[in-house]
UniProtKB/Swiss-Prot annotation:
MF (Gene Ontology): asparagine-tRNA ligase activity; ATP binding; nucleic acid binding
Stated name of the protein: Asparagine--tRNA ligase
Location in the cell: Cytoplasm
Family membership noted in the UniProt record: Belongs to the class-II aminoacyl-tRNA synthetase family.
Gene: asnS
Gene3D superfamilies documented for this protein: Bira Bifunctional Protein, Domain 2, Nucleic acid-binding proteins
Enzyme class: ligase
EC number: 6.1.1.22
Annotated keywords: Aminoacyl-tRNA synthetase, ATP-binding, Cytoplasm, Ligase, Nucleotide-binding, Protein biosynthesis
GO cellular component, one term: cytoplasm
Self-association and partners: Homodimer.
Gene Ontology BP, a term: asparaginyl-tRNA aminoacylation
Amino acid sequence: MSLLPTATISDIARHNGRVVTLAGWVAHKTEKGKLVFIRLRDGSGVMQCVVFRKNVAEETFIAAQRLTLESSCRITGTVRADERAPGGFELDVNGIEIIQIAPEYPIQPKEHGVEFLMEHRHLWVRSSKQHALLRIRAEIIAAAQEWLNAQGFVRFDTPILTPCAAEGTTNLFATPYFDLGTAYLGQTGQLYVEAGMMSFGKVYCFGPTFRAEKSKTRRHLTEFWMIEPEVAFALHDDNLALQEQFVSAIVQRVLERRADDLATLERDTKPLERCVPPFPRITYDEALRLIAERYAEVEGCTPLEWGEDLGAPHETLIASMFDRPVFVERFPSAIKAFYMEPDPNRPEVALCADLLAPEGYGEIIGGSQRIHDAALLERRIREYGLNVDDYRWYIDLRRYGSVPHSGFGMGIERATAWIGGTHHIRETIPFPRMLYRMYP
């Protein structure tokens, strides 16, 4: 005996005219006299199933009447084309096997507050828009890894528990580590992936990262996922070219394969269709001039002094001036990470860039050319007030066959928010971790 279905809703078209068994959950039900209309979802799609009393056994009709929202069941019937039905097909039911009758479902088809939905996140992920957004997230992850693999990159897994900071010491999650002192949840895999780069040439890591930032903005999570490529011999401009090819390939893949999900989210795809290389590039200095001229156009945006970092309103303003993602490059070294290569023509700025998504979604990628000189790297570590001994292994990478190299990190959640067109990053990961949210 098996409970597995004989067909899935996503490929129901090839079963037209045949008897199939679907297995899933009741997304909606309507009773009209001798008819019961059941919208069944199976994870791959949603299909209307029609139970006509005179065509089925009495126990089947009673079973249809008993079904409640989110009840689980197996439904057998004949697939019939009907352009009025969702997906263009419906099921003429001849049998229902109830797996479980669900009690009253907490999330009813009415307006619920965000806090209520977040408390019931384990159930909210079943809703059509959350399902569509998480499908897009999965497609982005698959597209990113498959594109990198096709370009000759090797996945190189990095540790989550680390002995030191990689992106500054003010936002670390610390935990006791046996007799060895304190371990920290990794802020990035980048330092370790550089070791892999010296072995394989082109590598990437993919996994969760953790930032103990006390931020409540719609763009921040304390736990998020990053994909971080690193390339030997790549200079700053090579890095930017790789990023725009990478992002463009991901967007095109989502447009091609997840059109139905984008439609469910009511996403205007025209801005995504314009996401093709080359992306515009402006310097940090140029960004400051544009902000000074037009800051009044965005609420909360104010002019910046040289050496101040861009905030969310500044990123929104800059991105609004372009019709596709835009690079802001060559930030002051003092406001960036210690490992970034200084511009040889202007050492006070780093060979780095942030890629800003259009439509107010902010930074989706941060990257740089890395320092490849051991003495300079050690000096920068000291200047940042970090313990050099914690980074001996990292400095070692520059002592044995060092080469110029570059890399970047793309946050999966921010990319998903932008491509999916959702306002808040909390909906782009199954179970978001935020400053005041750790349940469920």
